[in-house]
Amino acid sequence: MSHPSKLDRAAIVAAGMELLARDGLRGLSLRAIAAALEVAPNALYHHVKDRKDLERMLAAEVSVLIHAALRRKINSTTRSPEDAVRAMAAEYMTFAREHRLLYEALLVPRPAGGADAIAPEQLWLFALDLVTQVSGKVAAHEATVAIWAFLHGMASLQSVNAFDDEKPFSSFDFGLQAWMWAANAARLAEEDAARGRVKVAGKRAAVRHNR
């Protein structure tokens, strides 16, 4: 890597992402990044507090990458809400498989708020919007967390080669379909409740009119 003309957070993130893609979180250190940037380790502390701060910066950058990958996949064709969620789920798994070491950084602990929380929040809102179109608004947050947990679990199993003939990867389709049934059921229940409220409101209006 060439020596940066200006040492800033962007240069540190770029070097950190290269290191992360090659060695993963275990190989990540401020000293290694300083060596890649050809600067003294102390120079980094003007821009990065410590290793945890560095991990949060890189997790935010990984969020940007996976968000872009998901959005490209969704925008590639016109899809129904269910197809869009299926495409998102498949692309999430693809990213986790093809960029395993980057994916490891996606869920590092991070405090709420701050500049490094913006990208993960945007990724969350993107997924929430897709899920809401399937699950309805009432159960949207629960449904989004549920599919996130499912995908992360499957990605984690995939990363350790846990799937075989007895534990087939086709269980991904089984689990995703189960989520679809639950999400659709939540939306239908919400729609039924809304129709019930409209019907009750209509009856009350008729009673008032007849008085």
For the regions a language model picked out, list residue spans one by one.
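Hydrophobic alpha-helical connector segments
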Residues: R71-L101, P120-W124, I147
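C-terminal peripheral helix-coil segments that are non-catalytic and often amphipathic
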Residues: D129-K137, V160-R211
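Short hydrophobic clusters on alpha-helical segments that form packing/core surfaces
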Residues: I12-L20, L28, V62, I66, ...
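Amphipathic alpha-helical segments used for helix-helix packing
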Residues: M93-G114, S156-D164
